[in-house]
Amino acid sequence: MTKKQIVAGIIARLEADLALFTAAALHAHHAATHEECQPDNKYDTTALEASYLAQGQANRAREIRQGLDAYRALCLPAFDDESPVRLGALVTLGDETGCERRLFIGPQAGGMKLADVAGDIVVITPASPFGQQLLGLNVGDELQGMEAGKRTAYTVVSVV
């Protein structure tokens, strides 16, 4: 999977999430303002709870829109064996057992997994602790991470 395909996959997933959260926010807003939701007494908080839910859904939709804007504006730099890890890099890490992980350094949507025939690609952001460790490293550099609750040493195998 090329980096352009990765970004296209992220954008498609974010667009689907945006549609879902926008619809959920609209539904929660209608529930909060519906006449049957008006409180019967001072202990009836149904409308208040629905309004909190609507606001949360709207906030999440706004965050997703910001992520979409960031990915649509993302420049995908070319890397070589001397290039340090930075935003837009597809990094392959190897651990001491020989297993490899591929990470895409993106501006948002950290934690998203994209399926590929060569194995999952996980999006991480420069703001994450692991992303902060990766930034500036070169092929052959080592870093420490946590996996399944134990410390694991990784080596940067490639930066594309």
Model-identified regions with their sequence ranges:
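Helix-rich terminal scaffold detector
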Residues: 1-67
